[in-house]
Structure formats: C-alpha cells, structure tokens
C-alpha cells in the first residue's frame, strides 16, 4: 500500500481525542529504519524482533479501536530556532522516533468505561495499578493472535470478531500456553472449522512462527538490549504476557527515551509525551514533528505486515523553485540519526563517492552539512558553521559509543571529554604543558614556528635523546594529519630506510609511547602475504607500522615488479583508501564456487621501516617519502620500555602529545567536513613551482627515472599541510593574542618575563570568549599564511627525496674508505678516481652493490657549477676484483660535508707548520689515517702544492696549496701594528671551506624563558635534517631565495639545525608581496561580521617579546606596540556570537524529601483473587 504522505498525516496545531484513551509507547532509533541499499527509512529495515513488536502493537490497536501516531524526538532548540530551521532539516537532525498507539479505554474495559462501583476498586482502590484493569482483555488479544499463527483461526475471523474472553475460551483452551503449542487431545476439528482455521487444510509448518517465546524474546531485546533469543518464562503465561505488555504503558521504561531525556530533558517532546501519558484529550503540537498513520495502511485483513511497505514519514525538502517536492539529498537519506552507518552493509552500494566508503562514520554529517547549506543557504556562513558544529557534537561526539567503527568510536569519545574539561572550547583545547614564553626574537611573527619547533624538541630530544629527529618530527606530523580527513583522498607512505641500529624502531616506540592514551590508532605488522589486504577488516583512521617486513625467497624475486600484487595493493590503498577485489569463494548454499566482490577498506597511513629498498618498485617509491640516514653527534643512551614510559608520563609529554593529536583530529575533521576551505589554490601551485626551480638548480637529481612530477608536487604539498595545520593550531590556541585581549598596564621595574606572564592570563581570558566556530575561522586564516613557508620547509624533505638515501649511503662508504689504511685509489681520465676492492673497505658494500650503488649511477650532483654523475663506474667482485669510479673533486666535496672537522684540523696544522718554519715548503707527516688519504686524493687529482712520495705517509706541501699563502700573508699583516686597513682575502682557489655552515649575519637568536627563569636555546638538535644541508654546498646564500620568496613567513625554512630568514629584496612588484595575507583576508570576508582592515596586524600578534627576559617590559618596543593595539574592540565587534547554541541543562534544585506514602503490597494470592473477581465482573 502506498506510503505517500498526505496533508491529513501532518498534525501541526493540536492532537485531539474525542474519547478517553490508553497510550502505548514504542521508541526506535532512526538508524533502525535505514535501508542501506536505497537510503530510505522504511519499516522493512527494522530487525525481526522490532517488526514483531510493531506487529503486536498494531494488532492491539486494531483490536481496541485505536489510532497510531509517530513523533520525532527533537533536540532542544532555543529562541526562534524552531521557525528558523526548516521542518525538513529538523526531521533529518532528529535522532529517535516514538510511535504512540492510543487504545480506546472503553473498549479495553469491555463496557462503557465507567469505573464507579467496581468491586475491584472497592477491594484494592489504593493498591492496584489502573492499567491492571486491562490485563485480561489485552492478554486474550495476544493469545488470539498466536492462535492465528497456529492456524486455529483465520485472518478474516480474527480481524472482524469481538474480543470476548468467555465466548472464545474454546479457542484459547486448545493451546498449551506454557509451550505455545497444541494441547494434547484438546484440538477440536469442529471448533477450528467454526473459527475458519486452516490447521487441517494446510501442510504442517506452512505458516509464520509467532508464539509467546517470540513475544518474550522481542520484549527482552527491546528493553534490555539482549542480542540472543530469550528462553521461555518460568511463571504463569498470562501473568508473563501482562508483565511484558505493561512495560509499554510507561515511556521511561524505554532505554531510548531515558538516554534522550538525560541529554534533552526540557525538549518539547518530553512534555508532550508526559501529557499523552496522562491521557489529556487536547495537547498542543505546534512545536513538534507529529504525524498520523492510517492503521489500515500498516495492518489490515489482507496483510498483517503491510507496514513493511511503508516508509517513515517526514517533511520533504522543497526545491528552490517551490514547484515540486524533492527527496532528501542522497547523503542525508543514507545518514543515520546517530551518525552511524553499520558495518554490515557493503560500502560500495551506499554511494559512488569514495568519501562515503573510506569515512562511513562521517557520511551522515557530510550529508547533513549539505542539507544545512541547501536549507539555510550562504547568507551567514558563521551562523551556518555554528549550526554544523553543534550537529557534529550532538550526532557524533555525544553518541561516540554507538559508532561501529574503531578506533573512531573511542577517539570521538575522548574528544567529547576534551571539549568539556574547561568552560570554553579554546581553554579546553589549549595544551597545558609549562612551555614558558618565547622572547628575544628579531621577528615576532615567527613565534609559532619556534614554539612548534621547541615542542618537537621537548618531545623527542631533550628527554628521550632521539637521534633520528627528522624521522620523529615528520612521522609525528604524518600521524596527526593522516588519522583525520585531509585535503586530498590520496596519501603517501613514510619509508624509514637505514642500516640496522640507526634508531628507526626506537623512534617509532617513542611516538607510540607519546600517543599511548590513543594507542588504538596504531596497528603493527611484521609480515603479510600477497592477499592479506584483501580480507583484512575495515581499518579507518589508523596508522600501520611495518617494521622490517620479511618476504620469502619466491616473493623477493618479483616483489619489486610493477605488476606484483603487493605493489598493486599498496598503490590502490594509497591512492583510494580501499581495494576492490573479485575473489573466488565457495558458496555453501549453491554448493559451488562463485565470484564474490570484497571491498577492503584500508583508509590507513603506512610507516615502513626497512633496511633495503629492494621491495619498492618505481610506482611505490613514487608514492613514498623515503627518510634515509641522519647525521648525529649525540650520544645514544639505551632506555628500556619502562624507563621510556616513566619519562614520558613524568615530564608531561604524553599529555602534551595526546592533546596535540586530539585537538588536531577535531579541528581538521571539522574543517574538511563542515567547510569548503583548506584546499590548494593556483597561487600555491605557482609558489611551489618557484620553490622547486630554486632547489632544483642545487639539488641532486636522477638522470633517468620514472617518477611523476605531479606526485612530487603532491608529496610536498601533503607534508606541507601536515606541518601547516599543526603550526596553525598552535598559533591560535597557544600563542595568538586576539584583538579583544585587554592587555595589562606596565608596572615600574617589571621585567619582560613578569609582564608576559600577566599578558598570558589576559590572553586566556580572551581565548575563553571564543566559540569553536571562530577558532576554526582563525585556524583557516593561519593556514593560509603558514602554508607557503611550510612548502619551502617540506620541499627540502620531499623534493626528489630518493636521492637522499642514495647519497647518504655513498657518503657512508666514503667515510669508511677514507678511514681505512687499505684504501687503494687510482687516478683516471677527466679527473676521475677509481677505488679498488671496495668490499674490503665497507663490509656491507656487496649487499648494496646491486641496489643502492647501482642506483647511484643515475644520480646527477652539482660540482663546480656543472652536474656530474655521482658514480661513473661500478664493477662488482668477480674472482677477488671489484672497483668503483667517481669524480675526484666530487669525492672531496662529499668528504668535506661528511667530516668538515678533518679539513679544519688539516688547515690549522698546515698554518702552524708554515708559521713555525718560515719556508715555502714543509714536510708534513700527519698521524690521522683519514687526513693521509685526503692528502693522497689531492695529490692524485694534481692539486697544486701537494706532493706525495710513493705509498709513504709523508707529504711535501707548498704555500700555494689551498690558498695558504694568502692566509699566511693576512696573519702577517695582523701582526704588523703599523699596517692599517683591511686586505680582502681571495679564496677563489681555496679548496677547503673553513665555514661550510656559517650562520647568516643577523640570524635569528630564539630562546625560551621557562617559569623558573632558565633560558634555553631552541636549536640544540637537528630538526628536519635534510640532504640539502648535507649535499648542497653554498645553498644557504642562494640568490634565488631572496627574489622569489617575497615575505618573511614564506622565506623562512628549516635547514638542519638552523632556521634561515631570507628577506625579500627591494623592488618586487606589489602584486607578488604578502599574497598569503590576501588569502587569509578572503577567509575573514566569508565569516566575519565586519571586514578586517589590517589582516597582518590581526594575525601577527603573538605572546613574545624582542628583548631579553630580564629587561624592563616598558623598554620592549614590541610589547609597547601590543599594549597600544590590543583591547580596542570586543569579541562581538569581530564575530557574531552564535544563536544556535543548545540550551544547557538547568541546575537541579536541592532534593526535597517527599512524605512517605505507605501502601499495602498485594500478595500473590490477593492478586490472583483480584483477577478472578475482574473476570466475574466482565461476564
């Protein structure tokens, strides 16, 4: 029968009844009605026990001439929200529904409904529940329905006969009600025929099963949530039936109602249900979403399950033209009221969009967000964002335990706790780690960068002593970023490639320890097969650690091939987040093999630790960031697992890392599900092209290769976003001074440190005024500003990052070779040097000869303004031979970069020898093997001023070597006090660079002041260690940096343990300057109440100073400027305070002890007597 909603179905003013009635209440979650195949909400989607309850209630409604109503359980709105939010959207947002079956009271009594003079009242008028009066007739109605399913009475007779207990006793007496089966010897063919029963006409078993066990099991599952069938009751069947039915008289018996009432106790629907429960004949319904169902449409003589063809009523969305009604958006129709899509439905049939597959828990909120935009429009984006955020919190966070997707369920539960740990979102999300205050900085707008770097240093270096700082920082940001929705569905894989013992696994364990409270986001795999990822369960929002994965000898032969199934699976998982597999499986029903489609959801980040790159084909490397060896001068201290955990917890690092993770999870998810912001613009792509043009001229590259330029760009942008969002959130929540901050006045003799502490308290007061929507807007603006500088910073990590591991391995070999007395070098043509028997110099050379060293033959590296091959010839050992050929000058450059100390000591020793002798030539006898081999290399290359006699350790060195004569002359001038003026030093021929890592004049000098007044330098460890620092001589002073990077934020980048600030040159066109702030201005223009005239000033106020901590605060020009610019506006001047907040629960009044009313309890015998008296009265 049609389920179309007519005007008659809508109840908009009052619910009225002409006669007294008795209500029954049946509550459901809206998700119970969802049909995952069509996205409709229909009765046929109810579980079997729910359908049985619906059938039972409808039969009672039919038997006692009742009506059926359905009401949406709406959350509490305030103000004019019930009129501002369209009814169609209100239907979509409601989480639960209640069906109300109003039974005619007179028909339940079996007379005119009068209770005066009742013998039952006279006996127990104070003790007996009024509902007990309906016991016998309702129990009898249930028995008649069961008799129909036992084929003792036909549909027609059941549907049309009166509910007469005594006249129909011959029908019910044929059944043994303790077993719900036929009573032995009591089934009378004539009686069955009189009732039109089909028992003797149809074959046995040809009927629907419906018994007392069915009723008891359905009731138990409804009220207690049991997932298995409940056995029969051991008490009197009539009493058991009545007890089961009586629970539906009281709404508070339902767990769905109780949960709703706990969170929305003052919602209008609560008052409505209470008035229905009292039996009022006229109840206002103008604030409700109330519908009337035709009972015959749900239950009729032709089909007792007609309700299966009926959909859940609701208000349709109206097209903008107003000419026709249209269905809900597909995403909204597929949404579940509690924000859940069950795992049992294949994701491919929900929607063709991959987002609904890899983020099933977010499908409802994405659809509802679209419905909000559709219903409200873009008139006030901040208002709309407020509403979406409240819906996100109410649908997903408050019902996190019901999301059947792990670890999302537990993570969202922890997000809910995080948001409620303080009085406002800003104060709840800020980290509470005692960081101190950043000061003594020449560029205050860089404060968030240094604070972020300081936090990374605290997490990984100061207490844990991690030596792989580049891996730690990159991997930590990767985990925070990849466990939430991102700007692009495609993702990259992190590959930590070093030799054993370099700290890969230890770094992973530290990160897992830091994020211990959210450890459910981690999976660990040590081995897998080609088909493992076909059958793995759904993994969403996790990071999978693969540590030294091993493969069989057969797998190793083909694993790196592009058509290998493992390669293909990883490509699919990284590109789409899931694999779509057709597999052959045995069909037990058809008793044959058949094809089955398995969609394996792997919306997962991957971190792969490996000692070899052999398993990675070109396409997989193209989708990976390979983090190679990192230089380190720190001493490694072994720590046990217990020590690591104790240090992390004792220093507060676990709490800090967990807060960073949870707040980024929340804000990032809201950005990419509730707003249309946070994407890549054409200007960012142009900027990235400029960055790569600068780096590409100085960075090693592959001479040949199959990597994709588009993926190179994507990897840089992806890492840049991971870095940007974390820094932007840190900036807003931990350092930013909102313009409505009321700064404290300066006090005489107050130091910078003391003033910053008071200023921070004022900042927290201002932060406490911010709503979550305004925090997200500010984060979006900061993302626009910080993204360019992150692109520069991460480009050094990701740009052709495959060469980094290769170069590191070659340099490792050169370091071992130069430090070995058995080193044999032979000069070749065109300045080449051949090293014989390399396997004798490096014990791992043979292992890597066919891999890394073979790959190094394709690497081109800059030398003297030209590009040469890193390795020009390679022969593996055959019968004791083997050799490697390289450019000699390049060997010197690489050796200088690997161990500059050797060259500095050599320079100083030679200067001392010449000053002591005063001759043009000295005989030099170095003791260090490395120095001896370096001088031999100079001699083989024909360098002027160095001569070696045979294989001996002695060398004849002339003043002309490496510009020594110029330096000796300069020092002579310095000793001659009669000479004034400066003589320029000509170092054009100087091969030894005295200061390969010289700091730029006027470089940044950041420090932090802790509460105890101790000053610490930020850059005491290597962060973002890159191959640029190791293999790019002269990169620091590249002129292209100053001409292309037009703003201090964009020009700031990390170079190992140095952070460089390249200022823009004068004369750059205005349209190329400060474009980052123009992007931020566009964000504010969309959301703010009034336009921001000074975006740079609005964003660039941070909790920092430019003088030292013990200087006077009033002497700090930056603090004075802050004091003058802050506090001139209020929060309401900048943002429109939300009107979409849900009303808070009022404080409960103090409990008042009610007078005790003592009632006589009815014994079992008295109850039996009362029921017997009632039967006598009803005859």
From Swiss-Prot:
Domain of life: Viruses
Name recorded for this polypeptide: Uncharacterized protein ORF56
Organism, scientific name: Ictalurid herpesvirus 1 (strain Auburn)
Gene name of the encoded protein: ORF56
């Amino acid at each position: 029968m049609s389920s179309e909603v007519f005007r008659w179905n809508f109840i908009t003013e009052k619910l009225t009844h002409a006669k007294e009635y008795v209500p029954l209440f049946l509550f459901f979650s809206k998700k119970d009605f969802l049909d995952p195949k069509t996205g409709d909400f229909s009765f046929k989607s109810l579980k079997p026990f729910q359908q049985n309850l619906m059938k039972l209630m409808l039969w009672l409604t039919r038997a006692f001439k009742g009506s059926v109503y359905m009401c949406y359980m709406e959350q509490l709105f305030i103000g004019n929200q019930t009129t501002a939010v369209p009814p169609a959207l209100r239907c979509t947002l409601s989480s639960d529904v209640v069906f109300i079956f109003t039974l005619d009271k007179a028909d339940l009594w079996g007379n005119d409904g009068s209770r005066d003079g009742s013998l039952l009242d006279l006996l127990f008028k104070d003790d007996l529940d009024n509902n007990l009066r309906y016991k016998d007739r309702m129990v009898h109605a249930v028995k008649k329905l069961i008799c129909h399913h036992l084929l003792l009475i036909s549909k027609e007779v059941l549907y049309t006969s009166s509910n007469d207990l005594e006249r129909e006793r011959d029908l019910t007496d044929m059944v043994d009600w303790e077993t719900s089966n036929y009573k032995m010897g009591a089934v009378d063919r004539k009686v069955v025929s009189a009732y039109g029963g089909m028992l003797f006409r149809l074959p046995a078993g040809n009927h629907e099963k419906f018994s007392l066990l069915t009723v008891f099991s359905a009731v138990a599952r409804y009220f207690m949530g049991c997932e298995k069938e409940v056995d029969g009751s051991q008490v009197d069947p009539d009493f058991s039936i009545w007890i089961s039915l009586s629970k539906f008289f009281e709404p508070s018996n339902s767990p769905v109602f109780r949960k709703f009432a706990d969170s929305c106790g003052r919602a209008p629907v609560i008052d409505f249900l209470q008035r229905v429960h009292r039996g009022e004949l006229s109840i206002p319904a103008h604030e409700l979403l109330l519908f009337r169902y035709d009972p015959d449409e749900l239950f009729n003589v032709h089909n007792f399950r007609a309700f299966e063809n009926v959909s859940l009523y609701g208000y349709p969305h109206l097209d903008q033209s107003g000419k026709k009604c249209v269905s809900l958006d597909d995403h909204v129709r597929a949404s579940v009221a509690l924000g859940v899509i069950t795992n049992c439905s294949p994701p491919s049939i929900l929607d063709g969009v991959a987002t609904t597959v890899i983020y099933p828990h977010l499908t409802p909120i994405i659809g509802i967000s679209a419905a909000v935009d559709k219903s409200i429009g873009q008139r006030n984006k901040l208002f709309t964002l407020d509403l979406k955020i409240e819906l996100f919190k109410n649908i997903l966070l408050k019902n996190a335990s019901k999301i059947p997707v792990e670890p999302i369920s537990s993570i969202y539960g922890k997000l809910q706790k995080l948001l409620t740990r303080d009085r406002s979102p800003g104060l709840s999300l800020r980290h509470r780690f005692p960081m101190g205050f950043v000061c003594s900085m020449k560029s205050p707008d860089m404060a968030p960068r240094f604070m972020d770097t300081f936090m990374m240093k605290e997490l990984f270096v100061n207490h844990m002593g991690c030596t792989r700082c580049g891996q730690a920082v990159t991997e930590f940001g990767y985990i925070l970023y990849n466990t939430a929705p991102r700007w692009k569905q495609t993702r990259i894989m992190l590959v930590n490639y070093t030799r054993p013992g370099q700290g890969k696994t230890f770094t992973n364990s530290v990160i897992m320890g830091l994020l211990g409270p959210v450890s459910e986001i981690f999976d660990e795999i040590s081995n897998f097969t080609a088909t493992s990822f076909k059958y793995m369960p759904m993994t969403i929002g996790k990071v999978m650690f693969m540590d030294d994965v091993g493969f069989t000898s057969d797998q190793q032969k083909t694993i790196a091939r592009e058509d290998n199934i493992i390669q293909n699976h990883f490509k699919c998982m990284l590109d789409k987040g899931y694999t779509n597999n057709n597999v052959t499986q045995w069909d037990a029903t058809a008793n044959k093999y058949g094809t089955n489609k398995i969609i394996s959801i792997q919306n997962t980040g991957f971190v792969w630790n490996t000692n070899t790159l052999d398993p990675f084909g070109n396409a997989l490397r193209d989708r990976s960031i390979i983090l190679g060896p990192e230089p380190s001068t720190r001493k490694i201290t072994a720590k046990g697992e217990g020590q690591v955990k104790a240090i992390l917890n004792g220093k507060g690092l676990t709490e800090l890392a967990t807060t960073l993770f949870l707040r980024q999870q929340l804000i990032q998810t809201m950005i990419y599900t509730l707003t249309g912001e946070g994407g890549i613009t054409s200007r960012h792509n142009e900027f990235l092209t400029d960055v790569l043009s600068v780096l590409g001229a100085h960075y090693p590259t592959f001479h040949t290769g199959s990597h994709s330029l588009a993926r190179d760009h994507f990897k840089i942008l992806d890492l840049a976003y991971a870095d940007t969002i974390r820094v932007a959130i840190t900036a807003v929540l931990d350092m930013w001074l909102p313009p409505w901050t009321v700064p404290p006045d300066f006090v005489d003799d107050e130091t910078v440190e003391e003033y910053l502490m008071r200023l921070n308290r004022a900042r927290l007061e201002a932060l406490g005024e911010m709503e979550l929507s305004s925090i997200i807007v500010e984060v979006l603006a900061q993302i626009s500003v910080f993204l360019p500088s992150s692109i520069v910073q991460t480009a050094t990590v990701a740009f052709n990052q495959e060469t980094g591991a290769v170069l590191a391995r070659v340099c490792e070999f050169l370091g071992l070779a130069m430090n070995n007395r058995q080193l044999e070098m032979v000069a070749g043509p065109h300045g080449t040097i051949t090293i014989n028997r390399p396997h004798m110099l490096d014990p791992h050379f043979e292992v890597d000869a066919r891999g890394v060293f073979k790959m190094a033959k394709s690497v081109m590296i800059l030398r003297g303004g030209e590009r040469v091959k890193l390795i020009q010839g390679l022969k593996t050992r055959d019968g004791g031979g083997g050799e490697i050929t390289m450019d000699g000058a390049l060997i010197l450059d690489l050796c200088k970069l690997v161990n500059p100390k050797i060259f500095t000591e050599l320079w100083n020793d030679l200067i001392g020898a010449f000053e002591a002798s005063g001759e043009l030539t000295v005989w030099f006898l170095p003791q260090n093997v490395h120095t001896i081999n370096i001088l031999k290399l100079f001699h083989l290359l024909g360098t002027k001023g160095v001569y070696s006699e045979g294989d001996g350790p002695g060398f004849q060195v002339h003043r002309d070597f490496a510009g020594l004569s110029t330096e000796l002359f300069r020092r002579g001038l310095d000793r001659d006090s009669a000479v004034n003026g400066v003589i320029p030093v000509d170092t054009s021929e100087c091969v030894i660079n005295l200061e390969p890592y010289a700091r730029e004049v006027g470089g940044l000098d950041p420090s932090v002041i802790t509460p105890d007044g101790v000053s610490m330098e930020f850059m005491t460890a290597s962060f973002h260690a890159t191959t640029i620092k190791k293999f790019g001589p002269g990169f620091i002073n590249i002129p292209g940096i100053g001409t292309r990077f037009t703003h201090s934020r964009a020009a700031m980048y990390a170079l190992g343990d140095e952070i460089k600030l390249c200022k823009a040159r004068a004369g750059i066109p205005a349209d190329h300057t400060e474009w980052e702030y123009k992007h931020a201005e566009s964000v504010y223009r969309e959301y703010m109440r009034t336009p921001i005239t000074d975006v740079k000033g609005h964003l660039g106020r941070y909790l920092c100073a430019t003088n030292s901590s013990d200087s006077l605060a009033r002497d700090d020009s930056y603090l004075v400027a802050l004091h003058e610019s802050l506090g001139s506006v209020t929060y309401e001047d900048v943002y429109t305070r939300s009107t979409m907040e849900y009303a808070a629960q009022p404080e409960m009044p103090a409990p008042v002890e009610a007078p005790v009313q003592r009632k006589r309890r009815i014994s079992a015998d008295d109850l039996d007597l009362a029921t017997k008296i009632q039967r006598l009265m009803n005859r």
